[in-house]
Amino acid sequence: MSDVAIVVPTLDEATTLPRLARLLAALDPPPAEVLVVDGGSADGTVEIARALGLRVIAHEHCGRSAQINRGVAEVAGPLVCVLHADTLPPDDLVAVVRRTLADPRVALGGFTPLLSGPDKVRWVTSFHNWIKTWYAPMLFRPHLFLRGVRLLFGDHAMFFRRDQFLSVGGFDPGSAVMEEADLCIKLAPLGRTRLVNRVILTSDRRVAAWGEWRANWIYLTVGLRWALGLRKRLGDRYPHVR
């Protein structure tokens, strides 16, 4: 029996869920469970998810961090992968998660995201996402960087041990953005961060909406403000896109 649970936080993901559900059904080996935690969708996401055979719980108007915390608390699997609805998992995701976390020195893992849309691959943004995994902790948390900490984000399809996630308090429920970076720091005393050399496709919808250079500017400035402790109204600088 699989020991990997998948938590999918959703908010207005009616257009992305059908494709994700097909890919989840094709995972080999299959996960122990898939749990959709909805944050108050108004586009029929919950109904679509249930029609696709997915287990759904509602956790409305509390933000994505609280949704993920609720999902991790609800699932039973000892290993958990947080998968965004606009991210396309490889068919061996469960095996990769299990193999990576078999190393007791690793507390947190993630895939290498490649942003793409119907017309193009966002090579510039994908490269920036890759290098900031290293340069952000190296510049702003060098003592943790030397201990193996890297900064992962939602597009990385992060995975971890459920008991360790709960032991550090999970995500900060008050964080609108950069909650994944906070988790990387919180898990640092428990082990290293492993960026798996496996590509995972994720939607470029934010880049398409903002434009590539503006998107990278937003990513950079939000990250800098987080690193410098300037977190007031940080979420206002990261507009919601669907």
Give residue spans per PLM region.
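Glycine-rich, basic loop-to-helix element that forms the pyrophosphate-binding segment
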Residues: H59-V75
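Short, flexible, basic/aromatic active-site loop/helix in glycosyltransferases
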Residues: F111-P118, F127-L151
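Conserved donor NDP-sugar-binding/catalytic core segment of glycosyltransferases
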Residues: D92-V124
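Acidic donor-binding loop at a coil-to-helix junction in glycosyltransferase catalytic cores
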Residues: V177-L183
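Acidic helix N-cap motif at the loop->helix transition within catalytic regions
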Residues: T15-R19, D43-L52, D92
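Short, acidic, metal-binding catalytic loop of nucleotide-sugar glycosyltransferases
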Residues: R22-P31
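Short aromatic/hydrophobic "clamp" motif used to bind/position activated sugar donors
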Residues: V80
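A conserved acidic beta->alpha catalytic loop
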Residues: D38-V46, T87
